[in-house]
């Protein structure tokens, strides 16, 4: 191919390595619900699709509500998510205890549990494994991956991109996609 990834550091070493690893789709607005649910659903087969273990663990997502405000907000989110077709629900403190036996469900404790938003198909995944899996798949498709190579400038001629200046030299190109967090 004539595609290259130019990475200032190493694959997975930037913001990718500092995310929460929670795979979920519990957002309030319809556009966010749709894109995050699509993303979440892709994780169910991503290891097979990329032939790389993403270490996806569909253990569910539970957002505890410890104030009336949190409970109302999560209930609103739950309703919006259910209307969008997501598998989620509000659960009682007893159901929280059944799913997570170690939790303190004493109503007189400092932060009592009033309920929880529960998304059984949410989970966790290894962010580094995801980055490396995609990189390996890109490499197998012929994408050049250039690590430890800082882009220092984009050259233009007559308003059109003609190349990149990098810490490892010049790269001639007509198109540039910038992906940064």
Regions found by a protein language model. Give the residues of each.
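Helical element adjacent to the flavin cofactor pocket in flavoenzyme catalytic cores
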Residues: 117-175, 179-180
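Glycine-rich FAD pyrophosphate-binding loop
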Residues: 1-17
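Hydrophobic anchor at the start of a short beta-strand
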Residues: 2-3, 88, 176
